[in-house]
Amino acid sequence: LAVRNALIAYQDNAWMVVTTGKGSALVFYPFPAADHNDAYSLDDDARQRARELAATVVRVGRVGAASNWLAHASPNSLRHVSLGGHGNGTRVMWGDGRCHESDRTCGLWPNNKAFLSLLASRLTERAVVVLESCYALPLAPIVAESLRDGARVFATDACYNQEHLKYVLDASGDLVPMLFDPWHTSSMQVVVAPDCHDMPWVAPEWLRTLGVTGCADVTMDVCLSDDADGEVLDRKGQGPASACCRCGAGRLM
C-alpha cells in the first residue's frame, strides 16, 4: 500500500519542461504514454507555435501536476494557456494512456473545479485559453464559465491534424488559434467568460446575408476582418474588433 501511495503521489506531481519561453504563455501537453499517435510530439509545427507564443511547454500526467505548476505562476500573469491532449468531447486526456478513460485525476474533466479556479486566478485580463484537443467544443462553455475578465476559450467540434493549427494576430493584439484545414472540415470556435458584455454593433447588410446580424453571431473570420477598410463597420463606425467579446473587445462587468 505504501508503494502504491508513493507511486500515486509521484504521478500526481510528475511534470517535465520541454521548452522554456520568455513570454506569458503556458502550454500543457501529455506525456508520450498518453499520446498514441504522437499528435503532441514537439515536431517542427509545435516548436514554431511555441516560438510564436514565446511559450513554456510542460508535459503533465495528472491534473495535480498541472495544478502544482500553475500554483507557482504569479496571479494575473498568463496571457495564453493551451490545454493539449487527446479528447472525445468529455475531457482532455493526460494520464498514462490507460487511467484517463475513467479516473478524474488523470485528465481534465468538467468537474475539475479546483484546477479551473486556479487557472482563472493566473490569467490576465482578456486572456486566451485553447482547448488543444479534438471534439473539445462541448467543454468550452464549462471552462469559460469558470473564468473571468473576458477570457476567451477556443475549441473545435471536430478532430484535426495538429499541423493545421496556426496562430494569427487578431485586432486585439493577441495571437489566436485558427485551423487552416485544406478540406475545411474543422474550425476553431470561441466562448467568452460570462463577465464580458458586447457593445452595440449592427452588422452591415452583406454580413447579414451570411447570417451575421451582430456580436452574437460573430465568427473568428469576422473578428479578423480589417476594420480599416470599413467593410465590417456599422453606420456609427463601430466594428466587431472594438465591440464584440468574441473578438477580444466588449465591456467587462
Q: Where are these predicted regions, by residue range?
A:
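Active-site or metal-binding loop neighborhoods of secreted/extracellular toxin and effector enzymes
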Residues: L1-K22, A34, K113-L118, A127, ...
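Second-shell loop/turn segments in exported
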Residues: F31-N37, V128-S133, G230-D234
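Extracytoplasmic/secreted envelope proteins and their assembly/folding machinery
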Residues: D43, V63-L70, K113-A120, A140-A144, ...
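Compact disulfide-stabilized, cysteine-rich extracellular microdomains and processed peptide cores
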Residues: A193-M253
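A domain-level signal for caspase-like cysteine endopeptidase catalytic cores
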Residues: L1-A73
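Low-complexity, serine/threonine/proline/glycine-rich extracellular segments that form mucin-like
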Residues: S74-L78
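Catalytic cores of nucleophile-dependent amide-cleaving enzymes
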Residues: H80-K166
